[in-house]
């Protein structure tokens, strides 16, 4: 029975084994950390999408924003008046959130798999965390933002106004 707790050496089997071990070892504390990770991933997606949203606004859309009396449009206009500051705010915010995700994920893995080797943790990062961050935190939000730039810019303008 002791051989059941030894992780397999094949990558796919290792991932399945890790998922089973995580489910067995999960507690409310670990589930709470997982919820925080999901929330941070959502923030990363919003922030990442905002970069494309703000900087893909066309001159015609900017003219519409200038003619609008809506408060959200005013905030978007105001943020676009200083594009370098807006870009710096977006990039710093996104880096802060992504680093927080990595630190919290590392903490969670150390709690759930305390005896794992560096190689196992590296496989987890390469096979699980990196694709999740890239796809859900970067690529998908930017595709969405490219097609819904004003919607996302209006939605996140208050947040970036606060951070600025």
Where is each model-derived feature located?
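Membrane-embedded alpha-helical segments of inner-membrane proteins
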Residues: 2-164
């Amino acid at each position: 029975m002791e051989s059941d707790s030894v992780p397999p050496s094949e990558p796919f089997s290792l991932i399945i084994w890790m998922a089973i071990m995580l489910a067995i070892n999960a507690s409310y504390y670990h589930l709470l950390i997982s919820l925080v990770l999901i929330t941070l991933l959502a923030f990363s997606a919003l922030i990442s999408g905002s970069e494309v949203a703000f900087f893909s606004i066309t001159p015609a859309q900017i003219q519409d924003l200038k003619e609008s009396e809506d408060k959200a449009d005013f905030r978007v206009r105001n943020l676009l008046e200083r594009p370098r500051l807006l870009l710096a705010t977006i990039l710093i915010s996104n880096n802060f959130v992504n680093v927080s995700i990595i630190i919290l994920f590392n903490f969670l893995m150390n709690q759930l798999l305390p005896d794992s080797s560096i190689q196992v943790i590296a496989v987890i990062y390469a096979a699980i965390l990196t694709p999740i961050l890239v796809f859900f935190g970067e690529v998908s939000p930017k595709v969405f933002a490219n097609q819904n730039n004003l919607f996302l810019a209006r939605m996140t303008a208050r947040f970036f106004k606060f951070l600025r």
